[in-house]
């Protein structure tokens, strides 16, 4: 297997006295292998994974506290509803009460 792309099945004439320089070397099929480089510099130390220690103990900044106070109604997470149920139910209910009271007043 080690002499895969070097013409192992054919007798080599270059070994019988002729230099191998003028004959080009056949390349193996497929992607060429990666050439290994010698490490020139020492490897950097690995950084620890995950959340750093003590990051949970920090108090929020003043700007974040003001922002939290100004937010009124909190929306649920995820994709918003196509037809918000609260808005659709409240408006027709108020309109129907007003129209029914107007109709009853007109009938009398």
Curated annotation (Swiss-Prot):
Subunit: Interacts with E4F1. Interacts with NEK2.
Regions recorded as binding DNA: 24-34, 44-54, 71-82
Modified residues (Phosphoserine): 44, 100, 104
UniProt GO BP: adipose tissue development; adrenal gland development; astrocyte differentiation; base-excision repair; cell division; cell population proliferation; cell proliferation in forebrain; chondrocyte differentiation
Biased amino acid composition, Acidic residues: 95-108
Record note on modification: Regulated by cell cycle-dependent phosphorylation which alters its DNA binding affinity. Phosphorylated by NEK2.
Compartmental location: Nucleus
Stretches for region Disordered: 1-108
Tissue-specificity statement: Expressed in mitotic spermatogonia, meiotic spermatocytes, and postmeiotic round spermatids (at protein level). Expressed in embryonic myogenic progenitor cells.
Main location: nucleus
Entry-annotated residues carrying Phosphothreonine: 40
Function field: Functions as a transcriptional regulator. Functions in cell cycle regulation through CCNA2. Plays an important role in chromosome condensation during the meiotic G2/M transition of spermatocytes. Plays a role in postnatal myogenesis, is involved in satellite cell activation. Positively regulates IGF2 expression through PLAG1 and in a PLAG1-independent manner.
Record's compositionally biased regions (Basic residues): 46-56
Region Interaction with E4F1, annotated ranges: 44-63
Chain positions with N-acetylserine modification: 2
Start-end of Basic and acidic residues biased regions: 66-75
Family stated for the protein in its record: Belongs to the HMGA family.
Statement: the UniProt record of this protein carries the keyword Transcription: yes
The entry's keywords: Acetylation, Cell cycle, Cell division, DNA condensation, DNA-binding, Growth regulation, Meiosis, Mitosis, Nucleus, Phosphoprotein, Repeat, Transcription, Transcription regulation
Protein name: High mobility group protein HMGI-C
GO MF terms, alphabetically ordered: 5'-deoxyribose-5-phosphate lyase activity; C2H2 zinc finger domain binding; cAMP response element binding; DNA binding, bending; DNA-(apurinic or apyrimidinic site) endonuclease activity; enzyme binding; MH1 domain binding; MH2 domain binding
A cellular component term, taken from the record's GO annotations: senescence-associated heterochromatin focus
